[in-house]
Amino acid sequence: MLRLRGANSTRHSAQHARDYSTTVHLPLLGSHQRENATAYAALKVSELDVSDEAIQKGFAQVKWRARFEIARREPPVIFDSAHNEDSFVKLRETLDTYFPDKKAYLIFGASEDKNIPGMFAAMKPKIKRLIVTRADHPRALEEGRIVELARQAEVPYEAVSPVQSALARALENSAKDGSIVLSAGSMFVTAEVMKAWTILAKVSNLRKDEA
C-alpha cells in the first residue's frame, strides 16, 4: 500500500509471509519503495537483534537526491536519476500512481551507451513533449542523435541547449497547461537541471507553491 506523505515521502505497508505487518515511513517516493518496505519486514522476522525503533529510524533518515524528488507541487517539477529502460519503467509507474492525469515535458539527455529507444517506449504514454538537451559531460550523446531516435519512436520533441535553457523552456510550457516538468535520462543532465532550478529559484518566485 502506498500513501503520499508530504512532497517526497510515503507510508508503506510492510508485510512478510510469517505473519508480520506494520507501516513504515520512507522519505522517498516511487513504486520501487515497496521493495524497501519488504526489506523492512524481512529484517523484523530475521534472527538479527535489531529493534523496531532502530529500523524505523534508519529508514526515516534515508536521503537520496533526484529519486523522484518533487521540487514543486504545482505545476509539478520533478528531478529523477532514471537513466536506463528498467528505471524508466519504474519512473512511469510512479508518475501513474501520483500524477495519473498529467503528462510531462521531459527534459532528456543520455549517455552514449544507453538504450534510448527502450527508455522512450517505457515513458511514451506520459510524455507531453520531449525537450532534448545535452549535459556538459564527455559521455553525453549529441542532441542530433537523440532527436533522430525520438523521431523514430514518434515522440514529440524539440532540441534546446544548454540545459539551463531546456529547463526554462519546460517551465514556460508548463506554466501554460499545468503539465509536469520532469528531468530524467541522464544523471548528468538532472544534476545540471537541479543546479539551474536552484539559481532560478533565488531570483524568482518559483518555489512559492512548493509543498
Which positions does each model-derived feature cover?
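Acidic, glycine-rich flexible loop segments
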Residues: 183
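Short, flexible loop segments at boundaries between secondary-structure elements
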Residues: 135-137, 202-211
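RNase H-like, metal-dependent nuclease domains and their acidic two-metal-ion catalytic environment used
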Residues: 190
